[in-house]
A protein has these predicted regions:
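Conserved SAM-binding loop
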Residues: 88-230, 242-257, 274-276, 332-333, ...
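General small-molecule cofactor/ligand-binding pocket signal
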Residues: 14, 154, 260, 367, ...
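Fe-S ferredoxin-like electron-transfer domains
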Residues: 44, 52-118
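N-terminal juxtadomain amphipathic helix
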Residues: 1-77, 263
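Terminal amphipathic helices with adjacent charged low-complexity linkers/tails
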Residues: 261-269, 278
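Acceptor-substrate binding/catalytic loop of class I
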Residues: 32-37, 231-246
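Hydrophobic, well-ordered beta-alpha structural blocks that scaffold small-molecule cofactor pockets
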Residues: 88, 273-416
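Short hydrophobic/aromatic beta-strand or adjacent loop that forms the aromatic wall/cage
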Residues: 42-45, 268-272
Length: 416
C-alpha cells in the first residue's frame, strides 16, 4: 500500500480516525436503477504534522473542478460579497491602475461575479475605480448560463498550462470591456480550494497571473468551526482538505503570498486577503506539529447515534413514522451513519435536481413537499443548517395534518 502523503506539502500523513458509510458525494444522487451498485464509503481523516493540514486520504470527487452553488443569491450573501469587493477595491485604490482587471477562479454560473454591479470603491471621484471583472469555470453548462446573463465568463480551470489569452474583463455598470494583455491586478475565489487535490498548483496559477503586489481574496470553510461545534456531520468527501487558519497560511506563503488581512465570516468561513510578494521575502510560517484532537468530534458522533436510536425506538412503540427535510450534506451524512436510514420514510428537499432520486449511501427517496399529502408522517426532522426556522414555518403553513417539527440541537433531537 502506498504511503499516505499530504496533498499540500507532500509530507507523511497520520491517521486521526475513520468515518464509516459516508456518502461518496454531496452532489451526485443515484437513480432507482443505480441503487444496486451505489454504496457508502469509509473515509480516513488524516493530518500532516509538517504543515498541519487535516485532510481525507481519498481521491477527490469526480466533479472537483466544477463550482456548484446553492443559495448564492441570498440577500445575506450579496451583502457579504459586496462588502468584500469594496474592501478589495480600497486596497487596489492605493495602486496606480484605475481600471483594475479582476479574475474570479471558479465562477459557477457567475452568481458572485454579477454582484460586482453597482460596487464602487470610493465616493471621491479622484479615487474611484472602474473594475473590469471576468471569471473562469470548468463546467460548460454553467459558463453558457453566465454568458447568457451578459457576464465575461470563460470555460477553463486554473492549472498549469491554462492561458488567459483572448479573454476580456467587463465593467458591469457601463458594459465596457478591457482585454487581458498581461498580468492581472487581483483575483478572488470563494470556497473552492477545499475541493482541490492539488491546491498548490491552483495557487501557483494565481501567482503566475498576478502582478507583483497584486491581491488575492480567498475564502475556505473553517475546520476550527467543526472542532468548536464538535459536528462530525459537517465532514464530507467533497471537502478533501479541511483548512485551519494556520495550515492555510502555511500553504499560501509557500506559494509566494503574504497575508494582508484575515477574518472569520459567517462563523464558519476563513477569509484571507493576500498579496503577491517576492518568494524570497515571504514569512516562513511553520506548523508546530501538534496533533489535532478530534476526540470531541467522535464523542459527538456516538452521542448523536445513541440519541437518534433512542428517539426512533419511542417512535416505533407509538406506531409512528418520520421524514427528514433537507438533502444537505449534513443530512446525507446523518442518514447514512445513524439508524435514521432504517426508519425514515422519505426526504423532502426543494431542489428540483434532487427530487425523484435517492440519497447516497442511505438510499431514501427524495421528494417535493407535496408528497406529504400522499404519504403523511407524524414528524419531520429538519436538517438544513441556516434555514431551520424558515422550513419550520413552511411546514406549519402548508402541511396538513401538521406534523411535529424537530431539529438537531447539539447532540439531541428536539421539538421546535
Amino acid at each position: 500500500m502506498a504511503e499516505k502523503r499530504c496533498l499540500a506539502c507532500g509530507e507523511k500523513l497520520e491517521e486521526l480516525a475513520v468515518f464509516h458509510n459516508m456518502p461518496k458525494s454531496a452532489q451526485e444522487f443515484p437513480t432507482k436503477e443505480e441503487l444496486a451498485t451505489e454504496k457508502g464509503m469509509d473515509l480516513s481523516l488524516c493530518q500532516c504534522r509538517s504543515c498541519g493540514l487535516v485532510q481525507f486520504d481519498t481521491e477527490a470527487v469526480p466533479y472537483y473542478k466544477d463550482v456548484i452553488r446553492a443559495g448564492g443569491g441570498s440577500s445575506t450573501m450579496k451583502a457579504l460579497r459586496e462588502d468584500e469587493y469594496k474592501k478589495l477595491l480600497s486596497f487596489l485604490a492605493k495602486k496606480e491602475e484605475k481600471r483594475p482587471l479582476i479574475l474570479e477562479l471558479g465562477t459557477g454560473a457567475g452568481e458572485f461575479l454579477a454582484m460586482w454591479s453597482g460596487v464602487e470603491s470610493d465616493s471621491d471621484t479622484n479615487k474611484k475605480l472602474e473594475p473590469y471583472v471576468l471569471g473562469i469555470e470548468h463546467k460548460r453548462e454553467l459558463v453558457e448560463k453566465g454568458q447568457a446573463a451578459g457576464l465575461a465568463l470563460y470555460q477553463g480551470f486554473p492549472e498549469s498550462g491554462f492561458s488567459l489569452e483572448g479573454m476580456e474583463g467587463k465593467h458591469l455598470q457601463s458594459g465596457k470591456t478591457r482585454p487581458v494583455e498581461g498580468l492581472l491586478d487581483a483575483m478572488v475565489q470563494f470556497n473552492f480550494l477545499e475541493h482541490q487535490p492539488n491546491p498548490g498548483e491552483m495557487l501557483s496559477f494565481a501567482y503566475a497571473h498576478l502582478k507583483m503586489g497584486g491581491y488575492f481574496l480567498l475564502t475556505v470553510p473553517s475546520f476550527q468551526y467543526i472542532l468548536d461545534h464538535r459536528s462530525y456531520y459537517e465532514l464530507l468527501r467533497d471537502h478533501i482538505a479541511n483548512y485551519s487558519e494556520e495550515s492555510l497560511l502555511c500553504l499560501v506563503q509557500d506559494q509566494g503570498f503574504s497575508l494582508v488581512e484575515s477574518r472569520v465570516i459567517n462563523r464558519d468561513t476563513i477569509e484571507f486577503l493576500l498579496e503577491k510578494s517576492e518568494k524570497e521575502s515571504c514569512t516562513a510560517f511553520r506548523s508546530l506539529g501538534q496533533k489535532v484532537d478530534i476526540g470531541p468530534i467522535l464523542e459527538n458522533e456516538r452521542a448523536i447515534q445513541e440519541d437518534i436510536k433512542k428517539h426512533l425506538e419511542g417512535l416505533r412503540q407509538k406506531g409512528e413514522r418520520m421524514a427528514v427535510w433537507g438533502a444537505s450534506h449534513q443530512g446525507l451524512t446523518l442518514l447514512s451513519t445513524t439508524a435514521l436510514q432504517e426508519e425514515v420514510a422519505y426526504i423532502i428537499d426543494s431542489a428540483p435536481f434532487k427530487q425523484g432520486k435517492y440519497s447516497p449511501a442511505s438510499h431514501l427517496p427524495i421528494v417535493d413537499k407535496s408528497h406529504f399529502q400522499k404519504e403523511p408522517v407524524e414528524e419531520i426532522l429538519i436538517v438544513a443548517p441556516g434555514y431551520t426556522e424558515e422550513i419550520a414555518g413552511i411546514i406549519r403553513r402548508d402541511l396538513r395534518p401538521c406534523p411535529r417539527v424537530l431539529a438537531l440541537r447539539g447532540e439531541k433531537i428536539e421539538e421546535l
